[in-house]
Amino acid sequence: MNIKIPRIVIGGTGSGVGKTTIALALTQILRKKGLKVATFKCGPDYLDPTYHSRASQKICHNLDGWLMGKESVLNTFYQACHNVDIAIIEGMMGLFDGHSPNSEIGSTAEIAKWLASPVLVVLDTRGMARTVSAILKGLKIFDPDLNLAGAFANFTGSPSHIQLLKDASTEVPILGGLCKHSEQTFPERHLGLYSASEENVSEEKFNFWGEEGEKSLEVNSILEIANSAPEISIPVSNINTTLKRCKIGIAMDSAFHFYYEENLMRLRQAGAELVFFSPLSDSRLTDVDGLYFGGGYPEVFAPTLSKNKSLLNYIRDLSYKNIPIYAECGGLMYLSKGIKLVEGEFFPMLGLISATSIMEKKLKALGYVEVTTKKETIFGEVGLRFRGHQFRYSDLELDESNPIELVYNLRKRKSDQVSEEGYSKNSILASYIHAHWASNPNLAEGFVQSCLRK
């Protein structure tokens, strides 16, 4: 089918140039005008989408070419754009950065082409004048098939600096930008930005950037560019939602909230009713047939998680009854014997995995991976292949006296070397990998089937 939705991709010359801030400012301005805005984030990031969801008051969806493939990207875009007036897609890293230094696979540029979307690129223009024209010309001629329709000048010193840059840019129009305001930046920690739902991410900061954008962004020109986006063809999906067959508990609070919306959507389509609960504050769950623990910050909230003995005991009892439990990264840490912080303090957790989670100061793993199951799991049969991503500062110290079965063959995206991962015991499957279930539609169905057999 063909659809027409006004849209823009906000790319950048690299990370840290202010793509997120521009996207947030623009989202708030458009909502203030009465427009319904759908937001998207290119790549596997979980944190930026929390900001876009908060600004748009709609769930932000990830679009990742390598994890999802073209058909799933287009279908996710289509489904999220129902009853909206405009779509804003924030890129990742630099415009052409992705799977390989020699191709556009997995890049923002690839997503922009798949969506036939105009691109507005964000630059860090500190200490810059006429050079901005050279950079933009280079980006434009590097890939003539990309519709580079405009640019934003960020980290400028003053409104007059923005005007100077506009006058200098002859190849690509500069549609405004945001001046330096270091006191209004969003707070960060080891995995990046704080989640937008946390208390120290104030409404004041959101409002500030929206107001700054109103002063300096050429909104009418931006809307004109968005409206110029042509119709795109969306492959017809045959996915039908099955009648509710089981209930799956989803851990969702400040400690656990790293989920791809696509994964949750596929569980619903497979017939699962999702029951959200908080490992921080709930003492038990209503009757569930399975549990899903996503990633997050269990190390930050370790004292509170460890003190919630009622829920820990309740989940242990469910596990002893062989209820299927799937856990990723932070969820894996929660299933372990406990979390040892960098400072040395130890907090006991569920103890369902015979290992201890050790927090480190340095990054332990980052990047895309491809997984093949080498044994039957709660996802299904041997040989299932899927893709995922990892980003962590912790490691597992395994208990050699009580070995656990490893059920994943893991291959990093840029290597042929295979390693073992994926921790399985009875009806538990836990891993550091954040799996994207669009890479294999059988994962959601397999997990639901396991829940039905409990």
Swiss-Prot record:
Active site as annotated: C329
Transmembrane segments: none
Residue span, GATase cobBQ-type domain: 247-442
Listed EC numbers: 6.3.5.11
Cross-referenced InterPro entries: CbiA/CobB_synth, Class_I_gatase-like, CobQ/CobB/MinD/ParA_Nub-bd_dom, GATase_3, P-loop_NTPase
Cofactor dependency: Mg(2+)
Broad class of enzyme this protein falls into: ligase
MF GO annotations: ATP binding; cobyrinic acid a,c-diamide synthase activity
Keywords, in A-Z order: ATP-binding, Cobalamin biosynthesis, Glutamine amidotransferase, Ligase, Magnesium, Nucleotide-binding
Protein function: Catalyzes the ATP-dependent amidation of the two carboxylate groups at positions a and c of cobyrinate, using either L-glutamine or ammonia as the nitrogen source.
NCBIfam families tied to this protein: cobB (TIGR00379), PRK01077.1 (NF002204)
Other noteworthy facts: The a and c carboxylates of cobyrinate are activated for nucleophilic attack via formation of a phosphorylated intermediate by ATP. CbiA catalyzes first the amidation of the c-carboxylate, and then that of the a-carboxylate.
Record's protein name: Cobyrinate a,c-diamide synthase
